[in-house]
Amino acid sequence: MSSKGALIVISGPSGGGKGTVVKALMEMMPELGVSVSATTRAPREGEIDGREYYFISRDDFEEMIGDGEVLEYTTYCGNYYGTPKKEAERVTGEGRDLILEIEVDGAAQVKAKFPEAVKIMLIPPSLSELERRLRGRGTETEEVIQSRLARAVEEIALAPTYDYVVVNEAGDIEGCARKLIGIINAEHNRTCRMKEVIDNFTAN
């Protein structure tokens, strides 16, 4: 089997439970790698450079973009956020699968650069369930909730461009994480990833 790790891209609407499911996934499969993103925003209290993020200047980030050193990036509230290419190469080069929990725009960027990347969209069972989860946070205004719901519809419309779609059922975080594990394990048995093993039989 290929000694290089796979790029596993997980995205989905805000409030869909990505972060919670990915956390459960990492607890079940601690051998998975998670890349440290770079950002131009200032560190918050308690954040450490190289742990939560690599905190860099806007000029440095734009230079990385120009040099092709960013795997994917986006802007939010006037700041850049992105995955350094060398960070992804470091993790997969160690033979570990890399989990990228990113937005749909970033997922498309990764797939364009690495066609072998595995894209998984995590969605709620219904729009009404997503609305219930967003309201349950108790931290967002009505305007923000409606904006997130509209954005969710746009994002889920892109599901056909993904390799897999996984429904995050209410109250079944562990079950959802196990579905992701099944996908990851299946991906390791794809013919393209088993070329080394096959070649051992056909080399002579």
Regions found by a protein language model. Give the residues of each.
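Post-Walker A alpha-helix
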Residues: 21-22
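Conserved lysine of the Walker
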Residues: 18
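NTP-dependent small-molecule kinase module
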Residues: 139, 154-204
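Conserved phosphate-donor/acceptor-positioning beta-strand/loop module used by diverse small-molecule
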Residues: 98-103, 112-136
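ATP-dependent small-molecule kinase phosphotransfer cores
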Residues: 39-98, 104-105
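Extreme N-terminal, non-catalytic leader segments
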Residues: 1-7, 30
